[in-house]
Amino acid sequence: MTTLAQYLNTKATTPALNDVITTVTDVGKTISQLLRKGALADILGEAGNQNVQGEDQKKLDVLANDLLLDALAQNSHCAGVASEELDDATPANVDGSLLVLFDPLDGSSNIDINMAVGTIFSILPYQRQGQVSENSDFLQAGNQQLAAGYLLYGTSTVLTLTITDNVVMFSLDPDTNDYVLIEENVTIDADTSEYAINASNYRYWRAPMQQYIDELIAGETGVRGRDFNTRWVAAMVGDVHRILCRGGLFTYPFDTKYANKAGKLRLMYEANPMSLLIERASGGATDAVNRILDIEPIDIHQRVPVVLGSKNEVDYIKELHLNHTDK
């Protein structure tokens, strides 16, 4: 039985990375405990305000954000923290060598109905040690990530992590309060018959995405010649976890529903860390044309379309978009 601490001692590239990952995952234990208490801890319901994204915050959104922010601010290796919930990045320790970005509680609309939610995190190098970190320091492409992962709070609490060339999973043992290794080399099959998409936005999609979904719905009677099933958790962390466990496709494509937004999901807090996990598990991740991990960010709250999962389906969607005259 291998614990997270034992794994990090042998795999983490530096003591600093080891320590920051430990800080994030320790906070995950606290969030997991709060979620199990639910209404008994008075953490359900609305917080009464909105985040920088214009979304109504849940009480646990705010609490999870504050727990992570406070813990990382006390970590000497962390130079700065950026959260999906806050307008600007928060400087931490000027001598730190790492930057941490996180979505404190992905899928928070699921909290009050007792469905899966999670914490997504990304760790980047900090290049200006000795100086106070700024928003611009976080504007690095996803291919620069030193580590990425998520904590899924479901029937059990699962940590999925990548710090080398592979993806591993740990389960939080409620008896010992340790993360215990359960999967050492997560791999996604190239082919799949499952897809996750919010089909209510169909009329807002570009023609290539409409064509793709039409083909899947036609199933064995259409050009694909086989049937597909829809799965939708309404939390990216839940859908990505299912894909890492048994393959599949997840997409939140470009749409015209909100003309001023390039996509629904955030590049820095969601798309980049999840894309790194998916690619290192032999899957693919694109905005329908470009590799997500190669996108050069211009804002810490930048949004992008996302298509990720089983590689053959991701490649096919990209081909449909590249071959379409109105891309």
Curated annotation (Swiss-Prot):
Stored NCBIfam families: PRK09293.1-3 (NF006779)
Protein name, per record: Fructose-1,6-bisphosphatase class 1
Pfam name, any one: FBPase_C
Enzyme class: hydrolase
Cofactors demanded by this protein: Mg(2+)
A cellular component annotation (GO) from this entry: cytosol
Subunit: Homotetramer.
Pathway: Carbohydrate biosynthesis; gluconeogenesis
